[in-house]
Each structure stands twice: as C-alpha cells, then as structure tokens.
Amino acid sequence: MKLEQITEELKSQQADAAWITTPLNIFYFTGYLSDPHERLLALLIKSNGEQVLFCPQLEVEEVRASPFNGEVIGYLDTENALDKYDIKFNKLLVESAHLTLQRQRELIDAFGVQSFGDIDQTIKTLRNIKSDSEIEKIKKACELADKCIEIGVSFLKEGVTERQVVNHIEYEIKAYGVNEMSFDTMVLFGDHAASPHGTPGDRQLKKDEFVLFDLGVIYENYCSDMTRTVKFGTPDAKAQEIYDVVLKAEKEAIAAIKPGVTIKDVDDIARNIITEAGYGEYFPHRLGHGLGLEEHEYQDVSSTNTNEFKAGMVITVEPGIYVPGVAGVRIEDDILVTENGNESLTGYEK
C-alpha cells in the first residue's frame, strides 16, 4: 500500500522516481534503519515500483538481512555512490525540506534531472495513519512511559534535585528493556515548571509543590510522549486552581476527538476553557502534535489546522498554563483516533 501510493503520486506529478534520504522515511518504506552520519543513504523509488537503496559498503550485509528486497548499491568511502547507477530521469520527486542545494546539483549531474517536485506531503500523509503493527508498538511505548512516571513519582522526596530524578528514571527504566528516550527527559519542580521547555537542574524539591514530568520512550523505533504534573504534599490554592483548569481543558478536548471532527475545533475547546478561566495568555503553544516514528510529526493539533481527524491517527493532547513565579502545569496524553471515537494510550493517573 505504501509503495502503491508513492507510485500513484509519481504518475500524478508525471515524475520518473522519488529520491528519499531522511533515515526515518527510508525505514518507513524499507524496514532498514541506519544513521549514516555524513555518508549517503538514499532510497530511489521508480515509477514502475522498483526500489534501489544506496548505502555505504559497510552496511550492505545489514541491508540484505533487513526486510528490504529491492536492489542494493553499496559504495566505498573513496567512491561516488551516484556514479554506480547509470540512469537518466527527467523529473525527480524529493523531500524538499531535507534536500540540500549541493545534493540537488549532484543529482542533476548524475541523473540528468531536468526538474524536481515534492514528495514530502505524500509521505507525511502516509505516516499520519498508523497500521495495526505501528499502533501496537506505540501502545507499548506508552505503557513504558507510564512506568517512567511511576518510577519518578516513587523517587520524590524533599531535597532531591530535578537532575537526580531524571537520572533515576532513565537508569531504572533500562530494566524494562528501554535503550533510548524519545527526547531529553524533563522533570521540573514548582515555579521552575513555569518555563514550558525548562532544563532540569539542581533545583531541590520542597514540600507542597507540583512536579512536572515530560518524557517518552522509544520502543522498536516508535515514540511515546506524555506529561504529568503531580502533587508533592499540598500545593497552594492558586497552583491547584491552575491544575484543575488544565485538567478540565484536557479532558474536554479529548472527549471531542473522533473521525470527522475538525482539528482546530479541539484546540479551540481547550483554549477557550483556559481563556475563560483567565489564563489564556499563559497557554502559549498548540494543543498537540502527531506522534509515531518521531515524537513530533504531522499533524499539528492547532487553531490553524482545518483538517479533520481520521481513524488511525495518533496525536498528543497537552494543554498547559505557565505563570512565572507561581506554577507551571501541563498534562499530556497520547491519543489514538478510532473508528468511533478515541482511545488514550497513556494511563497514569491524573
């Protein structure tokens, strides 16, 4: 199905082939994942469906052991990979947001390309709807993220630092088979959490304040991304009020998600609740984003997105209020859009 949609797009744009070099996009189509560093790793998909993977010679055996069953062209560091494939293309579709001007010139020289088109949106649209296999992997990543929060909460005590909690979570979760986090784990105490993308440091935990955890893990290349703001003791009334508003905004936004609903309308639901409570200026970001091979991917859950939710999408819902000197609260869940509504894949208590 993936390959068919690429070849259909090639025909639609009257192009000869697609040239894909983003490692995660290559993995999406081939099942082979590699970080080539400065070396070229590229997937060529021709209009007849044939696939050619260019890779360093040192990776050829790994490629052949992967699910990829197309042609493999390995090259030495002393060779120009493009010289090893003799073909001419009139029009080539590329990832326009990723292709460098230098690489474009090399493609023109090697393949005689006369014009370029964009394949980015087609790939984004494909990756936006997850297969059953992808969903199962994301679910497992979410279960492990829940476990991370559990580990972190159990480690809280007066005097512990943000950095110590981060280190404890990332060490202990390895016992569950986790080798990589989706992004740098965030643990922020009290008013330090009023910086939405703050950096954990030596701030010590005090009694009666909130603790914000924002984290995710990678399971078989798929990401989770969740946030919980938990009580340590009894936070003051103002901080609790902020928490209650954020929780209401998140719950009502999630309740509205189902196929056919306009994405911006869900952002509006959360934003209106926060604004009506008097905190609109303290909610400075979109409501959420797509989730899959990357922790942030297509589509944005924002007030400008007029697309509709579709079954198979996985998105985050993460309203927040950040009042300097008072508190920062964000609550985030990973949501699967189902045929009749939605399912929350993250489940740690709120």
Curated annotation (Swiss-Prot):
Pfam families: Creatinase_N, Peptidase_M24. It comes from the Bacteria. GO terms for molecular function: hydrolase activity; metal ion binding. Its EC number is 3.4.-.-. Mn(2+) 1 binds at residues 225, 289, 318, 332. It comes from Staphylococcus saprophyticus subsp. saprophyticus (strain ATCC 15305 / DSM 20229 / NCIMB 8711 / NCTC 7292 / S-41). The keyword Ribonucleoprotein does not apply. Belongs to the peptidase M24B family. This is Uncharacterized peptidase SSP1059. Binds 2 manganese ions per subunit. Keywords: Hydrolase, Manganese, Metal-binding. PROSITE patterns: PROLINE_PEPTIDASE. PANTHER family: AMINOPEPTIDASE, DIPEPTIDASE YKVY-RELATED. Disulfide bonds: none annotated. It is an enzyme of class 3 (hydrolase). Mn(2+) 2 binds at residues 214, 225, 332. Its cofactor is Mn(2+).
